[in-house]
């Protein structure tokens, strides 16, 4: 130690004391690990020797540099580079709950990536990669990985069978007793990336068995929706349960997300930061090209708006909301919405479930000032459904007080009221958090639909399942029995289901060629099951009141034209044909058929007032209808009480437009009606300037 001057003890490692020292030759601060050899076991001495051996092989700006080792006072002394910025774990802890910018995350991540690539190139496994072993320079800009005490140099005859490392970062294959390999380091890399994005560990538990269970099932909360889909997907790929599905380091570095950060790293590290005055940019006079997306909104012109449009908007009306109310958003794009009796739910492009709820009593927004006479506008708060373990939601459906969602892996989860067995868990128990419908785990599901108290689900192999309340034959099982577990539904020969729809007490299927089959209550011929020619009315004994199994529609023209969209209301239904025509059938008590007459006909009728307008989507509430045009026009008709039509009108027997508070062109992406409520999602469509 004559070449060094001890300054202070900075830590106590697994095998010894860590000193901060001054190297006398150049007055440089260094770290010296003092490892007492005499008290060490053979394995511990091997680990200490191994660290020296590994550090000698490595030479990289993002790996702690090795200087020398020597014996003194019956202890092995290892001199290495000092990183004054502390550990990455300390850096994360000091952030509290203030999330890092994505650019900062990637700046750190690609340096760790380069370091690990250098290590693997020398056929070395780190085996203990964690934020506590990742160090920072004094500016906290340069990352250096260290602590190679339990690294393993691979030879053709050795396999790293020992289970080592910090438990929170151990991969699933290690939990199973399989050999440690490079993909295990990549799992740990994913844990570090997750920690950078979430400021917390991906896997934590009160005890080791619970931790192993979490790791083995790959259950971790999704990272914030503020980050790009590419970053979120990178986390998921690194934390794949199957080692073979984790990308190799070269593939990670080749991803556009990382290439940009790597380029910035090589051009910016060591540069001197300078302030730069931003010059004002004169508005461009170039014209704009027409986008291929059909949209509604302000007229297009060469001047682009100063304020960028939101990614998407979700509107709600009905239930006392007389006009469309834009719901609060969490800086995300909602691609699909679903309305229930009380629920308002949506799915974001990044695969998170967003819910809109009334604020708690006393939270403001719902009280009147003394002397006020007007009713306050109802307020809603938005929140992401928490507690989901790294799952990506791609579709949501709502019933009466319960919700079903479908993940990108084809798994259905349900939560809410368990009455009538509509959660599919084999009981009537209420469940507050989304829970997997275990009976369907052997199938990859592609769609789920909810009625008031029953559910239909469709698999990739076009297998159909139903559960919940069964009266009127709504489950299509040939009986009126209820079921609390999914039951496979028999399909008529030659029919292949493509889409499922549920109503209050009935169900419908769209088949691959565009035909429709229905079961359940056919009151008022709301399912179109009466066998009718155009303009014909059935005699009473020919009227079909209910069907216990899925049956082809028999009322013209529904049995003749391919159908694109269909929805079921309480006492009526609506369908859009391949040619863009909208037909309604069932009860017209409140004008919900759009014929400007309250006639009591059981025959389907073409909606009046939409001539020349091609329709694309339709949704039915309890006594009203909402239709969306191919150009994203929004129309409603039927009962107007409590804001059902999205305007101040009373009942309207003919379609009238619904005005949305949009200042930018938009396209409607999803619509859902339930009882007296409507949810509608729109996506902003911006025109890109024509390149010069």
From Swiss-Prot:
Q: How does it assemble?
A: Interacts with PKD2; may regulate PKD2 targeting to the cilium. Interacts with ANKS6. Component of a complex containing at least ANKS6, INVS, NEK8 and NPHP3. ANKS6 may organize complex assembly by linking INVS and NPHP3 to NEK8 and INVS may target the complex to the proximal ciliary axoneme. Interacts with ANKS3.
One of the protein's GO biological processes: animal organ morphogenesis
Which residue windows does the record flag with biased composition (Polar residues)? Answer: 282-293
Residue ranges occupied by any Protein kinase domain in the UniProt entry: 4-258
Protein encoded by which gene: NEK8
Q: Which organism is it from?
A: Homo sapiens
Q: What does this protein do?
A: Required for renal tubular integrity. May regulate local cytoskeletal structure in kidney tubule epithelial cells. May regulate ciliary biogenesis through targeting of proteins to the cilia. Plays a role in organogenesis, and is involved in the regulation of the Hippo signaling pathway.
Q: Which cofactor does it need?
A: Mg(2+)
Q: Which reaction does it catalyse?
A: L-seryl-[protein] + ATP = O-phospho-L-seryl-[protein] + ADP + H(+); L-threonyl-[protein] + ATP = O-phospho-L-threonyl-[protein] + ADP + H(+)
SMART domains linked to this entry: S_TKc (SM00220)
Enumerate the residues binding ATP: 10-18, 33
Disease named in the record: Nephronophthisis 9: An autosomal recessive disorder resulting in end-stage renal disease. It is a progressive tubulo-interstitial kidney disorder histologically characterized by modifications of the tubules with thickening of the basement membrane, interstitial fibrosis and, in the advanced stages, medullary cysts. Renal-hepatic-pancreatic dysplasia 2: A form of renal-hepatic-pancreatic dysplasia, a disease characterized by cystic malformations of the kidneys, liver, and pancreas. The pathological findings consist of multicystic dysplastic kidneys, dilated and dysgenetic bile ducts, a dysplastic pancreas with dilated ducts, cysts, fibrosis and inflammatory infiltrates.
User: Where is it made, tissue-wise?
Assistant: Highest expression in thyroid, adrenal gland and skin. Low levels in spleen, colon and uterus. Overexpressed in breast tumors, with highest expression in infiltrating ductal carcinomas and moderate levels in mucinous adenocarcinoma.
Provide the Gene Ontology terms for cellular component: centrosome; ciliary base; ciliary inversin compartment; cilium; cytoplasm
Q: Which EC number(s) does UniProt give? A: 2.7.11.1
Q: Where is this region: Disordered?
A: 277-301
Q: Does the keyword Repeat apply?
A: yes
* Record's keyword terms, sorted: ATP-binding, Cell projection, Ciliopathy, Cilium, Cytoplasm, Cytoskeleton, Disease variant, Kinase, Magnesium, Metal-binding, Nephronophthisis, Nucleotide-binding, Phosphoprotein, Repeat, Serine/threonine-protein kinase, Transferase
Per UniProt, subcellular location reads as: Cytoplasm; Cytoplasm, Cytoskeleton; Cell projection, Cilium; Cytoplasm, Cytoskeleton, Microtubule organizing center, Centrosome
Report the GO molecular function annotations: ATP binding; metal ion binding; protein serine kinase activity; protein serine/threonine kinase activity
Q: What Gene3D superfamilies does this protein's entry cite?
A: Phosphorylase Kinase, domain 1, Regulator of chromosome condensation 1/beta-lactamase-inhibitor protein II, Transferase(Phosphotransferase) domain 1
Q: Which family does it belong to?
A: Belongs to the protein kinase superfamily. NEK Ser/Thr protein kinase family. NIMA subfamily.
| Top-level taxon of origin | Eukaryota
Q: Write the protein's name.
A: Serine/threonine-protein kinase Nek8
The UniProt entry, under InterPro entries, shows:
Kinase-like_dom_sf, Prot_kinase_dom, Protein_kinase_ATP_BS, RCC1/BLIP-II, Reg_chr_condens, Ser/Thr_kinase_AS, STK_NEK, STKc_Nek8
What Pfam families would the database entry show?
A: Pkinase, WD40_RLD
RCC1 repeats sit at: 312-350, 410-461, 462-513, 580-631, 632-684
Q: Which residues carry this modification: Phosphothreonine?
A: 162
């Amino acid at each position: 130690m004559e070449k060094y001057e001890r300054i202070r003890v900075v830590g106590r490692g697994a095998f010894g004391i860590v000193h901060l020292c001054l190297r006398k030759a150049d007055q440089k601060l260094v770290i010296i690990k003092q490892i007492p050899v005499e008290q060490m076991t053979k394995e511990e001495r091997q680990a200490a020797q191994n660290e020296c051996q590994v550090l000698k092989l490595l030479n990289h700006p993002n790996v702690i540099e090795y200087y020398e080792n020597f014996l003194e006072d019956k202890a092995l002394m290892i001199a290495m580079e000092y990183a004054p910025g502390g550990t990455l774990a300390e850096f994360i802890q000091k952030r509290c709950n203030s999330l890092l910018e994505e650019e900062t995350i990637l700046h750190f991540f690609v340096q760790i990536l380069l370091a690990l690539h250098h290590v693997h190139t020398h056929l070395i496994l780190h085996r203990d990669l964690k934020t506590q072993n990742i160090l920072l320079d004094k500016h906290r800009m340069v990352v250096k990985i260290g602590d190679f005490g339990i690294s393993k140099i691979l030879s053709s005859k050795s396999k790293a069978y020992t289970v080592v490392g910090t438990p929170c970062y151990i991969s699933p294959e290690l939990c199973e007793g399989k050999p440690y390999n490079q993909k295990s380091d990549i799992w740990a890399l994913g844990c570090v990336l997750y920690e950078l994005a979430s400021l917390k560990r991906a896997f934590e538990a009160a005890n080791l068995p619970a931790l192993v269970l979490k790791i083995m099932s790959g259950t971790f909360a999704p990272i914030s929706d503020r980050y790009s889909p590419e970053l979120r997907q990178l986390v998921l790929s690194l934390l794949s349960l199957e080692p073979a599905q984790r990308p190799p380091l070269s593939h990670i570095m080749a991803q556009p997300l990382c290439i940009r950060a790597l380029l910035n790293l090589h051009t910016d590290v060591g540069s001197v930061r300078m302030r730069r005055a931003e010059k004002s940019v004169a508005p461009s006079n170039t014209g704009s090209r027409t986008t291929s997306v059909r949209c509604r909104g302000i007229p297009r012109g060469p001047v682009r708006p100063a304020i960028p449009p939101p990614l998407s908007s979700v509107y709600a009306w009905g239930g006392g909301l007389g006009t469309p109310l834009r719901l609060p958003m969490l800086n995300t794009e909602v691609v699909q919405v679903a309305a229930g009796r009380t629920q308002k739910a949506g799915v974001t492009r990044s695969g998170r479930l967003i819910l809109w709820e009334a604020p708690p009593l006393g939270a403001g927004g719902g009280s009147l000032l003394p002397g006020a006479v007007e009713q306050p506008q109802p307020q809603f708060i938005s929140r992401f459904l928490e507690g989901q373990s790294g799952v990506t939601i791609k579709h949501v459906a709502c019933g009466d007080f319960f919700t079903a969602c479908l993940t990108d892996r084809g798994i259905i989860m349900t939560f809410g009221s368990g009455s009538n067995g509509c959660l599919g868990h084999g009981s009537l128990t209420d469940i507050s958090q989304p829970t997997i419908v275990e009976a369907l785990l052997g199938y990859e599901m592609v769609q789920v639909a909810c009625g008031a108290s029953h559910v239909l689900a469709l698999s990739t192999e076009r297998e159909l399942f139903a559960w919940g309340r069964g009266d009127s034959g709504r489950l299509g099982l040939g009986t009126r029995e209820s079921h609390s577990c999914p039951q496979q539904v028999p399909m008529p020969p030659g029919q292949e289901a493509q889409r499922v729809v549920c109503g209050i007490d009935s169900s419908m299927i769209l088949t691959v060629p565009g035909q429709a089959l229905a079961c359940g209550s056919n009151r008022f011929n709301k399912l179109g099951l009466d066998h009718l020619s155009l303009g014909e009315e059935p005699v009473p004994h020919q009227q079909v009141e209910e069907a216990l199994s899925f049956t082809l529609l028999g009322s013209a023209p529904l049995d003749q034209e391919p159908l694109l969209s269909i929805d079921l209301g309480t006492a009526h239904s609506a369908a859009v044909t391949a040619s863009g025509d909208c037909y309604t059938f069932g009860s017209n008590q409140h004008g919900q058929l759009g014929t400007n007459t309250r006639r009591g006909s059981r025959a389907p009728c073409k909606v009046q007032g939409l001539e020349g307008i091609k329709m694309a989507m339709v949704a039915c509430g309890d006594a009203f209808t909402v239709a969306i045009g191919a150009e994203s026009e929004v129309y409603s008709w039927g009962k107007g009480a409590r804001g059902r039509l999205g305007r101040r009108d009373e009942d309207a027997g003919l379609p009238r437009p619904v005005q949305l508070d949009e200042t930018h062109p938009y396209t409607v992406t999803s619509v859902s009606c339930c009882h007296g409520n409507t949810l509608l999602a729109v996506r902003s469509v911006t025109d890109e300037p024509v390149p010069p």
